[in-house]
Amino acid sequence: MGANAADAYVFVTPQYNFGPPPSFLNALNYVYKEWNYKPAGMVSYGRVSEGVRSALVEKLTLTTLKIMPMVEAVAIPNISAQFDDMENFMPDDHHVRSGNALLTERALQIGRSAENDAAINSTTANTYRIPYFYF
């Protein structure tokens, strides 16, 4: 699926020297027009700061490029401690609640959009697609 085909995005990024990783900024500079006016969720990770500093800079960059970051987000501290012996990610309850809040808010937005679409077009909305991008 190309970036333009999705209805929203979730960006999963580490904190890199107190800011976004260069790969994330490069991707935004390369295909931002395809992402214009679409919602974006954020999952950040790092050590003690949970990648929050990076996510704040990312949100500013996204709005500048006409991508709409959501308020709800997932922040994962001490990322290396979140994996079991088999290297499977083991989220804490807080991570699960944050992820559910992010997806619930997006579902509410979709519902509102579907109501508006139905009112305007007298048709039901299509199924929405939300890809994840890992940087």
What are these regions (language model features)?
Residues 70-135:
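Glycine-rich phosphate/pyrophosphate-binding loop and the adjoining helix
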Residues 1-68:
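Helix-loop-strand module that forms the ligand-binding subsite of alpha/beta enzymes
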